[in-house]
C-alpha cells in the first residue's frame, strides 16, 4: 500500500511547486534561525546520536564475518621448579555457510536506513516548528498592536465623554462604561505582552539557546507570503515522506531478522588455527620453536528449552507489527494531506466572509461615532460597535496565521523539508 489509490480533493490554482519548506516562506531572519535550530536543537541531536549508533551496529554485525586473532602470554613459577612462560596466537573464523551473518548485516543496514529517515523526519518537523513559532510571534505582535489601538480609541472616547458631560450632553455613567472597557483592554495588553515573551521562549528552546529573551528577533510586524505547496501525484508525494521511508526500512529490517532467527537453528562451522610455544624465559617462549594446531568444528543446537523457537516467533511478530505500523503511518499521512487541503479551503472562505464583516464593521463604527456625537445613540452602543470592529480585526489576524501555518503543515505532510 503506497498511496496509489488515494484521490485528493482539488486544490487552489495558486498553489506553487516547492521542494523544501523554506521555499514556501521568505522572511527576514528566518533562515538564520532554521540553521541555528538544525545545529543546536537538543532533541534533534539525540536523534542524530541514535542514527550514529545504528550505523555503528552495522560495523558490529559485519565484524562477525571477519577473522578473529587472539594473542596470549602467561608465566608461572612454582616452588622447587624453574619459571615457565607460554605464548600463543589463535586465528579463528566462522564460515557463513547459511548467510546468517550476511542477514544480520542486512538487518543492521536497514535499521540504520530507518534511523536515517527518522532523523530526516525530525529535521523536517523541527523546521516546520521554527517557522510556525516565528509566525506565532508575529501574530501576537499584531494582536498586541490591535489591543493598543483599541485602548487608544477607548481613551479618546473617555475624553469625548468628559467634554460632552461638561456641556451637559452626557452623564458620568457613560464615563464609567468607557473606563471599564479601557481597563479590560489594558488587561488584554498585559496578556499579549506575556504571550509574546512566552512565544519567544518557545522559539529559543527550539534554537537550543540558554538565553531565552530572543533579543535579536527582527522587527517584523507583517506576515510574510506563504505559498500553498502544489500537490503532485499522491504516490510521489507520500513516497518522499521520511516517516514512511523509516517505516518501510523497519519492515525490511524485521524481515531480515526473521531470517537470522530461523538460521540460528542450523549448524555452524568454525575454523581455527593456533601457534603455541613455551620456555624458561620470556624470549624463549616467543615462538622460537612453536607448535601449531588446526581445528575444524561443527556445532548445532539440540535443546535450548524452546528459546530459539521463541526467538523466531518474536521476530515474526515484530515483522508483522512493523507492517501494521507502516500502514498506520501511511493512513495518517493521507489524512494529514487531506485535512490540510480541506483546511485551506475553509480558511479561504472564512477569510473572505470575515473581511466582508470587518469592512461593514468599519462603516458601522464611523456611523455610530457620528450619531453618538449628535446624541442619537448612547455610549454602550458605540463601545459595542468598537468591540465588534476590533474583534473582527483580531479574528482576521488569527485566521491569516492559521492559514499560513496550515500551508506549512501541508508542505510537511507532502514530504517537504529542508535541503541537506
Language model: regions and residue ranges:
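Membrane-embedded beta-strand positions in outer-membrane beta-barrel channels/transporters
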Residues: 34, 88-90, 134, 234, ...
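Small/polar (Gly/Ser/Thr/Ala-rich) solvent-exposed segments
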Residues: 45, 65-84, 92-121, 245, ...
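Periplasmic alpha-helical coiled-coil/stalk elements that build and connect Gram-negative outer-membrane
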Residues: 101, 117-233, 343, 347, ...
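Alpha-helical hairpins and coiled-coil heptad-repeat segments
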Residues: 158-175, 364-382
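Acidic, low-complexity, intrinsically disordered peripheral segments
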Residues: 225, 374, 395-420
